[in-house]
């Protein structure tokens, strides 16, 4: 071939294959640096080949290094570090263009992430008034679009939340203030109630002792009535016995009258006998003189007997009259005692009524006392609850104030309107 | 997809494999790519912070690494064929390594890029390394 030896042809063939293997990355080392062509014209070509193959290997190395560095940098990108770019310049134009594109992507993404980070830092400083916006070139449905839309949704949510929080806080502050007032009113009412209950308890004590005294007096009256009843009964008995005695006196008087009548009769006959004796004596003369004196004496005695009998009769009549009178009095007494007994019975019944009424009163008082005690406990409970409610109201006010202060310390869309609106209504200092 | 096929104890790298690692000034690994991890049988966490001799194979002569270090310390690029050991096994793989000295923000480091060597390249390396200590 062109006057080239077959050995040189073989070497040339090997060298051509080797060149392509190396440049396409199938081999690493050029094995024919030291081989020589015997044909003179080929010796010069060999020099060119040697130089160019070394250049080619160098270019390969440059590209390799650039790719290795790219891998290192991309790993850092993968790990979230966007601040290092690919520095080495590859020999291959395509690789270089690729590297520039990669670097551009890293820079753009870094700037987009930086925007987001800055925004989130602003949010972290409690300023929710701004957001990041889509770029014109952002592809619909892409991750960035989702991210930015998500940020907007989050911003809206936070703003709404803060608006609600501020509004609720102000309203809560107001409500808690009202609650506190109501609780204070309740507390005052409870204290007043406690005072009146104390008075009531005092009055009840007084009433209790009154009723107890009443009951005692009724008891006294009952025993007095019983004593009186006994006395009246005794009186009635005595009156009865008096009446019996009077009757006996009358019977005795009648017996006396009968005896007197006998005596009068005897006196009369004695008088007649003495008269007869005097007449006989006179007849007898002096002999009868002494006898006449005796007869006269007998006559005198008979007359005196008759007189005495008259006196006794009169006295008996008087006694009869007195006993009659006594009878009447005894009868009246008996009637009087009966009236008294009736009255005592009525009194006893009245006293019983009073006693019953006192017992019922005592029961009523007992119930009232229980009720008052319960009311007192309830009032104390109320006062305690009022105190607790006051603590809660205070805590609520504190929390509401903290809530309002917290919300008001943040910057968000709609804050000024709420502040203005509510300040106007509630006159709250936000 | 695996970057090698096994042939006995040898892991034969695929044509597309590209193993990269980086060490600091003292040869402590500070970066390794997926191909490197796969071939050597380590996870990246196991490699970072370790000396690069973690993959050293006993068949490799000291002289090779002496040359490597002398070259890169001079600020020159080193290349050569290296037999490496796989983690916890008698498996190994051959690479053609190119080691670059790097100066980044005043800090020295070294990046090694590895490609698959062809059979005759490995064979002549075996012969060469037999003559070295
Ligand atoms: C960037 C870089 C990559 C390295 N890659 C390897 C490697 O793949 N395999 C290896 O055995 N040594 C590699 N070394 C060399 C090791 O640092 C070490 O010198 C070698 O494993 C010998 O270990 P020794 O120094 O503990 O004897 C690399 C060194 C550098 C700087």
Regions found by a protein language model. Give the residues of each.
Chain B
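Short, charged amphipathic alpha-helical "coupling" segments at sensory-output junctions
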Residues: 1-8
């Amino acid at each position: 071939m062109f006057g080239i030896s077959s050995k040189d042809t073989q070497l040339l063939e090997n060298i051509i294959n080797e060149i392509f293997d190396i440049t396409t990355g199938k081999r690493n080392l050029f094995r024919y640096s030291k081989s020589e062509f015997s044909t003179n014209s080929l010796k010069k070509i060999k020099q060119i080949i040697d130089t160019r193959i070394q250049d080619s290997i160098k270019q390969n190395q440059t590209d390799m290094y650039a790719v290795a560095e790219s891998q290192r940098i991309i790993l850092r990108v993968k790990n979230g570090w966007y601040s290092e770019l690919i520095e080495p310049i590859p020999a291959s134009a395509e690789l270089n263009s690729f590297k520039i594109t990669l670097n551009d992507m890293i820079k753009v993404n870094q700037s987009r992430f930086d925007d987001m980070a800055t925004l989130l830092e602003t949010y972290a400083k409690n300023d929710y008034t701004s957001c990041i916006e889509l770029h014109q070139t952002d592809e619909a449905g892409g991750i960035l679009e989702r991210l930015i839309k998500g940020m907007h949704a989050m911003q809206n949510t936070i703003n709404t939340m803060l608006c609600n929080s501020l509004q609720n806080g102000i309203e809560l502050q107001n409500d808690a203030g009202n609650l506190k007032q109501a609780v204070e009113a309740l507390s005052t009412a409870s204290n007043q109630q406690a005072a009146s209950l104390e008075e009531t308890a005092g009055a009840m004590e007084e009433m209790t002792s009154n009723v107890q005294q009443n009951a005692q007096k009724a008891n006294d009256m009952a025993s007095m009535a019983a004593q009186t009843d006994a006395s009246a009964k005794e009186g009635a008995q005595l009156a009865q016995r008096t009446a019996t005695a009077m009757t006996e006196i009358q019977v005795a008087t009648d017996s006396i009258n009968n005896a007197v009548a006998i005596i009068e009769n005897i006196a009369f006959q004695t008088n007649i006998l003495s008269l007869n004796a005097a007449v006989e004596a006179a007849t007898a003369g002096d002999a009868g003189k002494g006898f006449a004196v005796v007869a006269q004496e007998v006559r005198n005695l008979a007359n005196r007997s008759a007189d005495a009998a008259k006196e006794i009769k009169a006295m008996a009549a008087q006694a009869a009259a007195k006993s009659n009178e006594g009878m009447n009095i005894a009868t009246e007494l008996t009637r009087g005692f009966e009236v008294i007994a009736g009255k005592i019975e009525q009194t006893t019944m009245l006293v019983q009524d009073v006693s019953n009424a006192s017992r019922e009163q005592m029961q009523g008082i007992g119930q009232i006392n229980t009720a008052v005690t319960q009311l007192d406990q309830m009032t104390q409970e109320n006062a305690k609850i009022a105190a607790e409610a006051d603590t809660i109201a205070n805590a609520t006010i504190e929390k509401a104030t903290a809530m309002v202060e917290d919300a008001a310390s943040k910057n968000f869309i709609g804050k000024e309107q709420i502040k203005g609106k509510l300040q106007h209504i509630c006159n709250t200092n936000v | 997809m695996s970057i090698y096929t096994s042939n006995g104890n040898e892991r034969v790298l695929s044509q597309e494999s590209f193993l990269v690692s980086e060490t600091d000034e003292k040869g402590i690994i500070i970066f390794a790519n997926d191909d490197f991890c796969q071939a050597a049988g380590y996870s990246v966490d196991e490699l970072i912070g370790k000396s690069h001799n973690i993959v050293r194979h006993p068949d490799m002569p000291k002289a090779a690494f002496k040359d490597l270090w002398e070259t890169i310390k001079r600020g020159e690029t080193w290349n050569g064929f290296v037999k490496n050991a796989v983690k916890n096994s008698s498996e190994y793989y051959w690479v053609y390594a190119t080691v670059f000295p790097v100066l980044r923000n005043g800090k020295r480091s070294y990046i090694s890029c590895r490609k698959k060597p062809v059979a005759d390249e490995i064979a002549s390396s075996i012969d060469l390394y037999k003559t070295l200590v």
